[in-house]
Amino acid sequence: MSIRRLTISHGWSASLRSLGLLLLALLFCVNNTKAAVYNFTLGGPPPVALNPNTGQTIKMAGSGTFDTVAASVVGAGSYSISNSEGRVIERGNWEATQFSDFEAQGGPSPGIQGGILHLTITLFPKGGDPVTGVPMTVVCPVEDGAFDEDDDLAAVGAFTVPHGGITVFHLLRP
């Protein structure tokens, strides 16, 4: 009887130990996935990017939310393209269609974060056909623990040179 009790106790002990190790491994994996949900804002004033080949600029306004683990994004806003003289030649709306990547750079608080977001958008020009598959990069750089507002950027297609405006990321859920 005592041998049987020892065997059962040892079996339960080994099972509990294995279960504990499994739970510990799962917790370690979850804590190291760097799961995060962020909001991004283009505005205050809206960022402007220059196309160095044409001299045209694009002004992007809007906001969105993305999840780094689910690789999802929802976002929308408006845009305008101006010629090299500053006259608006196109207006429309944009919508986020695909999350690509996010490089978190931290920040002074969850409400103010730096980073680089890569996504794909569709442009809906007024009076024109939708333009799909357009790459967009939102940049809110942090250098040496401080924001570099001069390099904030919402690059869209060939519009890649920062030309003023504000972008910001907000950490909603770590």
Where are these regions (language model features)?
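N-terminal secretory signal peptides that target proteins for export/translocation
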Residues: 1-14
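Extracytosolic low-complexity repeat regions of secreted or lipid-anchored proteins
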Residues: 109-161
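Bacterial N-terminal signal peptides
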Residues: 18-29
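Mature extracellular/secreted ectodomains of secretory-pathway proteins
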Residues: 77-131
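N-terminal segment immediately downstream of the Sec signal-peptide cleavage site
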Residues: 31-100, 158-174
